[in-house]
Amino acid sequence: MSDKSDLKAELERKKQRLAQIREEKKRKEEERKKKEADMQQKKEPVQDDSDLDRKRRETEALLQSIGISPEPPLVPTPMSPSSKSVSTPSDAGSQDSGDLGPLTRTLQWDTDPSVLQLQSDSELGRRLHKLGVSKVTQVDFLPREVVSYSKETQTPLATHQSEEDEEDEEMVEPKIGHDSELENQEKKQETKEAPPRELTEEEKQQILHSEEFLIFFDRTIRVIERALAEDSDIFFDYSGRELEEKDGDVQAGANLSFNRQFYDEHWSKHRVVTCMDWSLQYPELMVASYSNNEDAPHEPDGVALVWNMKFKKTTPEYVFHCQSSVMSVCFARFHPNLVVGGTYSGQIVLWDNRSHRRTPVQRTPLSAAAHTHPVYCVNVVGTQNAHNLITVSTDGKMCSWSLDMLSTPQESMELVYNKSKPVAVTGMAFPTGDVNNFVVGSEEGTVYTACRHGSKAGIGEVFEGHQGPVTGINCHMAVGPIDFSHLFVTSSFDWTVKLWTTKHNKPLYSFEDNADYVYDVMWSPVHPALFACVDGMGRLDLWNLNSDTEVPTASVAIEGASALNRVRWAQGGKEVAVGDSEGRIWIYDVGELAVPHNDEWTRFARTLVEIRANRADSEEEGAVELAA
């Protein structure tokens, strides 16, 4: 109450001070107006006199210009502006004495001051003059232009304020605003409503666990994270001057540059990145699957995290998990909300980001009709109106599923070589635009072609060349004027990457620049001669076959030298993502190296011709050595 009374007292004192200032200002304004009125009255006769003198001088000058010299006694200075007749000094003397002679004359002014008339008094008579004929010369004179710069004739009289008044106003204005603010605060305090009722702990828990609150919180927390984590560089120079000034940088995009890292302290720690995939519908989204965390037995074994490249937040967009390690994962093509995972137990799980649950919305049964071994390959193939989920497990079983029903597979097939040996599949790839034929890599190091339908359904050709298990396989993806869809690359534990064609069962070329297991390989989606591979020493290599086939075109080693398990190109081909054995995902910008020129396809065709010629020469030399 004391604070409120002090506030009111302070307000009253300010109001009194404000009233005093206003009265003082009003009094000064009245005095100023009174002074101006007095000065105006004093200036008026002087102004009239000065105008009359000016007109008189103009008249004299006009008379002199035409040869008339006014007599000195006829140019007396008028005493007042209202006077119509002015007496000469001699006349004044005669008038004082009372003698009114016949020669008395007066200078009389017309209503128009510019016209001068000499008249004699009618009562006193007129002196007789001798008249004669004279020549009259008529001359016209333009009136003199009079320009007045007086404030009185152009703008209203300016009001001059004293410095004291200005200081008073400067002092009053903020006080007025402060007083009004205090009044508003006082009114708000008086009209303040009663505080809302405090909720009980039971009511709070009921709200926190309600489905509506969970959905709202799950949706809005992502928006807030995006806003808080955004740190765009407002000083970025698009002209490239900063890149030119840096020492050691040849050109922007000549080398791999680190963009960002995805890592969650809770869900990524002590887990291995097993698979990654980019979304076709939302290119900024990437999903990654993780193995189990042996240090956290109570946590779910399988985890899939959806990361967002568009926003600079450090947490995943979505967190999904299941009870078995997720060995493979992909976005369901034509279904942007669905994520498919293949688990170590053999189950196929399906997550939906429209559901606020983190567990799968669908899963396949653990039965002989489906998979019972680890599933390392999941892929959605087909078109918008006719597509299927294709999965392959390490026991050689391939299943085709409908995403609407995962209870039973639509069709299944045993991938068996020579009708007796099941193929332990570790990788699968479909050529671009093909949904029937595919290639698979196996644990024995052999590569096979296979077919889903037709008379030759099952395992077809055999490609031998690797000396260890095949860890990665990928078909050529870049679409251009020349079709290279028959090409594919494989990586293996034998420290090599091999280039193959489905038209020949021997490798076209073997890239042997690595000194550790090569865990994955992938073609660029836009450049015909570019592919990326990763190895167990934490090294990412980019090979541009149009530039060199002996050493990588660009290479980078990640911090800590953790083994890199997976590599995936973004859809635009400008970024490449790699996952390591510590649960971290590294994003690198490829830059201009990934942009193909118009002649890249023809150059790559010539490169393939040279590779085939060199392989033929080496085979001939080998045959000669064997014969010798």
From Swiss-Prot:
Keywords: Acetylation, Centromere, Chromosome, Cytoplasm, Cytoskeleton, Dynein, Kinetochore, Microtubule, Motor protein, Phosphoprotein, Repeat, Transport, WD repeat. It holds the Pfam family WD40. Acts as one of several non-catalytic accessory components of the cytoplasmic dynein 1 complex that are thought to be involved in linking dynein to cargos and to adapter proteins that regulate dynein function. Cytoplasmic dynein 1 acts as a motor for the intracellular retrograde motility of vesicles and organelles along microtubules. The intermediate chains mediate the binding of dynein to dynactin via its 150 kDa component (p150-glued) DCTN1. May play a role in mediating the interaction of cytoplasmic dynein with membranous organelles and kinetochores. The modification Phosphoserine is found at S50, S83, S90, S94, S97, S162, S180, S618. Residues 1-114, 152-204 are annotated as: Disordered. Residues 105-114 have a biased composition (Polar residues). Homodimer. The cytoplasmic dynein 1 complex consists of two catalytic heavy chains (HCs) and a number of non-catalytic subunits presented by intermediate chains (ICs), light intermediate chains (LICs) and light chains (LCs); the composition seems to vary in respect to the IC, LIC and LC composition. The heavy chain homodimer serves as a scaffold for the probable homodimeric assembly of the respective non-catalytic subunits. The ICs and LICs bind directly to the HC dimer and the LCs assemble on the IC dimer. Interacts with DYNC1H1. Interacts with DYNLT1 and DYNLT3. Interacts with DCTN1. The gene is Dync1i1. InterPro entries: DYNC1I1/DYNC1I2, Dynein_IC, WD40/YVTN_repeat-like_dom_sf, WD40_repeat_dom_sf, WD40_rpt. Transmembrane segments: none annotated. Belongs to the dynein intermediate chain family. Signal peptide: none annotated. Its main location: cytoplasm. WD repeats lie at residues 268-317, 321-361, 370-411, 420-460, 465-510, 513-553, 559-598. It is found in: Cytoplasm; Chromosome, Centromere, Kinetochore; Cytoplasm, Cytoskeleton, Spindle pole. GO terms for cellular component: cytoplasmic dynein complex; kinetochore; microtubule; perinuclear region of cytoplasm; spindle pole; vesicle. This is Cytoplasmic dynein 1 intermediate chain 1. Residues 130-146 are annotated as: Interaction with DYNLT1. It comes from Mus musculus (Mouse). Disulfide bonds: none annotated. The modification N-acetylserine is found at S2. The lineage of its organism: Eukaryota, Metazoa, Chordata, Craniata, Vertebrata. Residues 80-90 have a biased composition (Low complexity).
